[in-house]
Amino acid sequence: MIRIVLAAFAALSLATPAWAQEKAAVLYKAEGCGCCDGHADHLRANGYKVRVVELADLEPIKKKHGVPAAQAGCHTIEVGGYVVEGHVPAKIIDRLLAEKPPIRGISLPGMPEGSPGMGGAKVEPFTVEELGSGKVFAVD
């Protein structure tokens, strides 16, 4: 009986919970972009395990994920099967991962002042759009 309990415990300790897998992110950024590092730090502070990949050209990543030029940010994040463009706050990414909507991803177009990684004071609400359709996903 003890062997069965120990075996079950060992098996459970090796399993990775779904939420932990979803919190792993890859952030693709242009070489030398400091605001992208700031956004990665924001995500880490909110429980994400972020791997940063510096590229000379982000266009192939954006093309791979079908990111429209009007929604392109200075960096592209792959997380939980979704694409996140730009300085989207972690709490909105959390919502995306929790709700699992049938969309490709989300974008915070432009580089709004006060958004995570950008610095400065927030001067207006952030409107986060569904990638492609442009429909509002969240306002923060």
Model-derived features: where do they sit?
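Stable alpha-helical elements in mature extracytoplasmic
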Residues: G32, H39, E54-D57, P89-I93
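Bacterial N-terminal signal peptides
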Residues: V5-A15
